[in-house]
Amino acid sequence: MSALFPTYNRWNIAVQSAEGTVVTDVNGKQYLDFVSGIAVCNLGHRHPHVQKSIEQQLNQYWHVSNLFTIPIQEEVASLLVAHSAGDYVFFCNSGAEANEAALKLARKHTGRHKVITFRQSFHGRTFATMAATGQEKVHSGFGPLLPEFIHLPLNDVDALKQAMSEEVAAVMLEVVQGEGGVRPVDPAFLQTASELCQQHGALLIIDEVQTGIGRTGKPFAYQHFDVEPDIITAAKGLGSGIPVGAMIGKAFLKESFGPGVHGSTFGGNPIAMAAAKATLEVVFDPAFLQDVQEKGRYFLARLHDALASLDIVKDVRGLGLLVGIECQTDVAPLLPLIHENGLLVLSAGPNVIRLLPLVVTKAEIDEAVDILTNVLNNANASAVL
């Protein structure tokens, strides 16, 4: 009997080892990993540059607290601001913590309380980020949520215009909703959101927890659009599997986040910073990012060609290497079949298969497309769905 709370619907796969794009279970079966730790292992498993950086830091010091100046924090912060619209960084341990920090900063700076977010969004499971999340299933059973969070339909310009006022502290969104089904924001809607924030003195917060750190072929996904957020949040891929989160903000916000306003015991931990520094050194290389964009286009084209004739496939969409296959009904019965064929994928909402490779080769993309085509063809023929 497990001593763990049953908070996860775990797969029947026990991992023995992982390296690059391959996961090996305790029975010796190997899987091509298109889950990537849920958009965490952006450089694959145990990338040698990241592993070397961690090992070097382990031989120096592990933790001293944020009462000290920690040089490697400054190095990672400099990398983040050099590749984003931000000027200052607050380090924490997860995406939820980064989003909590963003929400606190928005309220503190503006003196306002209302925050606009969007249906099917996902921002975390703490009380503030749960309230920000636009999914009822995340709210269920927890009683009254924190007030003043407004959930609007994504890409509905009229609804956003009606909701905006001088009482709104921030608009918070993902440019591609990951947990919400790999749903991209409309560029015109994002531009309108940015303009409305400027007009009303609200902050634009872009949650890049899943879309950031090279996932879409840019350092951050908002950089595909003509907007500049006031606050950016990052986590997941930032540490290549070592827990780390970051909130990145513009210079005018600095005075609102002074000593004692917020903090994190483990935020900016030297081991996490070593992982983040090495990760960013690889991911922010222009050649790496260009390769992600090219492979993303290749992957989408292959999926469109292979799946276009299948009735059960409603849509194939994505940005860079954040890709979703939307099916007509629930995809849960399909996941074990795909796994049995040696490909690890996961869902995004009830009817989307989510694919999150990053350092894969075109040959591995071809292999994955063949497996997906085979399973979806069989499902299409036998009406498994």
UniProtKB/Swiss-Prot annotation:
Key words of the record: Amino-acid biosynthesis, Aminotransferase, Arginine biosynthesis, Cytoplasm, Pyridoxal phosphate, Transferase
Alphabetized CDD domains for the sequence: OAT_like
Subcellular location, record wording: Cytoplasm
Annotated binding of pyridoxal 5'-phosphate, by residue: 95-96, 122, 207-210, 265
One example GO MF annotation: N2-acetyl-L-ornithine:2-oxoglutarate 5-aminotransferase activity
EC number: 2.6.1.11
GO-annotated biological processes: L-arginine biosynthetic process
Cofactor: record remark: Binds 1 pyridoxal phosphate per subunit.
Positions contributing to N(2)-acetyl-L-ornithine binding: 125, 264
Note: May also have succinyldiaminopimelate aminotransferase activity, thus carrying out the corresponding step in lysine biosynthesis.
PANTHER family given in the database record: ACETYLORNITHINE AMINOTRANSFERASE, MITOCHONDRIAL (PTHR11986:SF79), AMINOTRANSFERASE CLASS III (PTHR11986)
Subunit record text: Homodimer.
Family as reported in the entry's similarity comment: Belongs to the class-III pyridoxal-phosphate-dependent aminotransferase family. ArgD subfamily.
Protein name in UniProt: Acetylornithine aminotransferase
Organism from which the protein derives: Geobacillus stearothermophilus (Bacillus stearothermophilus)
Lineage of origin: Bacteria, Bacillati, Bacillota, Bacilli, Bacillales
Gene it is expressed from: argD
